[in-house]
UniProtKB/Swiss-Prot annotation:
Ligand binding ([2Fe-2S] cluster): C100, C131, C191, R263
Name assigned to this protein: Biotin synthase
Catalytic activity from the UniProt record: (4R,5S)-dethiobiotin + (sulfur carrier)-SH + 2 reduced [2Fe-2S]-[ferredoxin] + 2 S-adenosyl-L-methionine = (sulfur carrier)-H + biotin + 2 5'-deoxyadenosine + 2 L-methionine + 2 oxidized [2Fe-2S]-[ferredoxin]
Known function: Catalyzes the conversion of dethiobiotin (DTB) to biotin by the insertion of a sulfur atom into dethiobiotin via a radical-based mechanism.
Keywords: 2Fe-2S, 4Fe-4S, Biotin biosynthesis, Iron, Iron-sulfur, Metal-binding, S-adenosyl-L-methionine, Transferase
Length: 354
């Protein structure tokens, strides 16, 4: 790591001035900082698995998992630990160093916690970093997950405080900040970013990044999502964001949070190779890899590796675990799955009913 001075006092007009730079100047500034901190040709790869899909009681206007919108999404119960580990092993074999697990909840409940903690500890035993996104967390829940070994917790701010009320009404901006505070206090790393292309103004994109950069400690990982418009959601007919505005957002995030991983997240399937290359040059150095991001499509793994080869990029290397370690973990998971099979109907429930 470099000795770049980190700031937590960014003014809104300073960030807007960065967005307004000529593109070449902005990219040069972002890339120069990026090279001082990171290997510019290394990309951290994460795999995201939906461990509980649909029937969420929240009203996020971008989200097909909300029970309030008819998007044709089939709701699913919390999946078994054994299946989670099978997916984690596949992700690791494909080059992922971090495995992220997401559930469509407002927040987890007490009966969920034993299963969630088992998922964390068993995935970690495979030599992977772990991340979860489960909605809001209390301080006690954050401590439990940290004790189980959870490395990262994702909870996005979504947009600026000023535009937030146009996106969601069932959870406040302060609720999100409180969850992030609980995560950090428990000793976990924070993963927090937002979504662009939701009809916001450029000032809102600056406002989102200002909130993230002015946290007491910058998020360790900053996912920047491009809105994926899903039929049946209130945002299905919004105009597309200019791709260069997305690249600008990546570049400004890199400049004001130079030590954070900046992740290309949702919407990457619609991006051209050239646009992705610009994002990597601007400072993006993390992606989600393969299949789906919870419910939206993502580029196939072989497409990503082909692009990496063309650009001379390489994945970050994960921790090593032996074949014997993997076998032991899978055997434990199978035994646990059999032990809880009779209780499954009570344990895995419809979150939308709560």
């Amino acid at each position: 790591m470099s000795d770049i001075q980190l700031r937590h006092d960014w003014k809104h007009d300073e960030i807007e001035a960065l967005f307004a730079l000529p593109m070449n100047d902005l990219l040069f500034k972002a890339h120069s900082l990026h090279r001082q901190v990171f290997d510019p040709n290394e990309v951290q790869i994460s795999r995201l698995l939906s461990i509980k899909t649909g029937a969420c009681p929240e009203d996020c206007k971008y989200c097909p998992q909300s029970a309030r919108y008819d998007t044709g999404l089939e709701k699913e119960r919390l999946i078994e630990i054994e299946k989670v580990l099978t997916e984690a092993r596949s992700a690791k074999a494909a080059g992922a160093s971090r495995f992220c697990m997401g559930a469509a909840w407002r927040n987890p409940h007490a009966r969920d916690m034993p299963y969630l903690k088992d998922m964390v500890s068993e995935v970690k035993a495979m030599g992977m970093e772990t991340c979860m996104t489960l909605g809001m967390l209390s301080g006690t829940q954050a401590e439990e997950l940290a004790e189980a070994g959870l490395d990262y917790y994702n909870h996005n701010l979504d947009t600026s405080p000023e535009y937030y009320g146009e996106i969601i009404t069932t959870r406040t901006y302060q609720d999100r900040l409180d969850t992030l505070s609980n995560v950090r206090s428990a000793g976990m790393k924070v993963c927090s970013g937002g979504i662009v292309g939701m009809g916001e103004q450029a000032s809102d994109r600056a406002g989102l990044l200002q909130q993230l950069a002015n946290m007491e400690q910058h998020p360790d990982s900053v996912p920047i999502n491009m809105l994926v418009k899903v039929a049946g959601t209130p945002f299905e007919n919004l105009d597309d964001l200019d791709p260069l505005e997305f690249v600008r957002t990546i570049a400004v995030a890199r400049i004001i949070m130079p030590h954070s991983r900046v992740r290309l997240s949702a919407g990457r399937e619609k991006m051209t190779d050239e646009m992705q290359a610009m994002c990597f040059f601007a400072g993006a150095n993390s992606i989600f890899y393969g299949c789906k991001l919870l419910t939206t499509n993502n580029p196939e793994e072989n497409e990503d590796m082909t692009l990496f080869k063309r650009l001379g990029l390489h994945p970050e290397q994960g921790k090593y675990a032996t074949v014997e370690d993997d076998k032991e973990v899978m055997a434990k998971a199978s035994a646990k799955a059999n032990a809880i099979k009779d209780k499954q109907s009570g344990a895995f429930y419809d979150a939308g009913a709560l």
